[in-house]
Design a protein with these regions (language model features):
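SDR active-site strand-loop-helix element
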Residues: 12, 37-41, 79-85, 89, ...
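Hydrophobic positions on the long internal alpha-helix
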Residues: 64, 68, 72, 117-118, ...
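Conserved Rossmann-fold NAD(P)-dependent oxidoreductase catalytic core, especially the SDR/UDP-sugar
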Residues: 66-102
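Glycine-rich NAD(P)-binding loop of the Rossmann-fold in SDR/ketoreductase-type enzymes
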Residues: 20, 52, 56-67, 101, ...
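NAD(P)H-binding glycine-rich loop region in Rossmannoid oxidoreductase-like domains
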Residues: 22-61, 71
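Active-site Tyr-X1-5-Lys
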Residues: 102-130
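Substrate-positioning beta->alpha
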Residues: 138-167
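Adenosine-cofactor binding site in Rossmann-like domains, unifying the SAM/SAH pocket
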Residues: 5-28
Length: 170
């Protein structure tokens, strides 16, 4: 792992940080003295899981996010939610935060559902990004979707500046 200027970053396991258990979330955040929650947990792959098992998609991407927002509000913590730019129709690319939303697939609908909870809480930031790894291994994901990718490591480099913002950033 590359070092960043960010300090005291924790990556808890599912066992120690259960997003379906409000008490588990609260205990962990208090114990570790967390000030900002970067919510990257999500059901994403395989993409067709969102069509085959809708309840899994709802639980992990909507209910889990709602639980995190509830606890962040209780503890007055900032939450940064990693959403997706798939919440846009995907016809033109380079979307602005104010462009109309029309999720491309069930995965995007589930991420938009999570966004709804996050937007209700004012001490929050939603990042609508499409992250991928280096080297870029997905020569194609969708043949009829225009999107902008960003590499994981580039998102991490931006966090020191992003944590000051609230609202939505593409």
């Amino acid at each position: 792992q590359k070092k960043t200027k960010l300090k005291n970053i924790f990556f808890p396991s599912r066992k120690e940080f259960n997003i379906f258990n409000l008490n588990s979330i609260k205990k962990y955040l208090i114990k570790k003295k967390i000030k900002i929650v970067i919510h990257a947990a999500a059901l994403s792959r395989p993409m067709d899981i969102h069509d085959k098992k809708i309840s899994l998609s709802i639980d992990k991407n909507i209910i889990g996010t709602c639980n995190l927002v509830k606890v962040c509000e209780t503890l007055n913590l900032k939450i940064i939610y990693l959403s997706t730019n798939y919440v846009y129709p995907g016809k033109k690319g380079d979307y602005k935060e104010t462009d109309p939303l029309l999720p491309y697939n069930n995965y995007a609908w589930s991420k938009l559902g999570g966004e709804c909870a996050v937007q209700m809480y004012k001490n929050s930031l939603i990042l609508r990004i499409c992250m991928t790894e280096k080297p870029f291994i997905h020569n194609f994901a969708f043949k009829d979707l225009i999107t902008n990718f960003i590499f994981h490591e580039d998102v991490v480099k931006m966090f020191p500046k992003l944590i000051k913002h609230k609202g939505i950033i593409n």
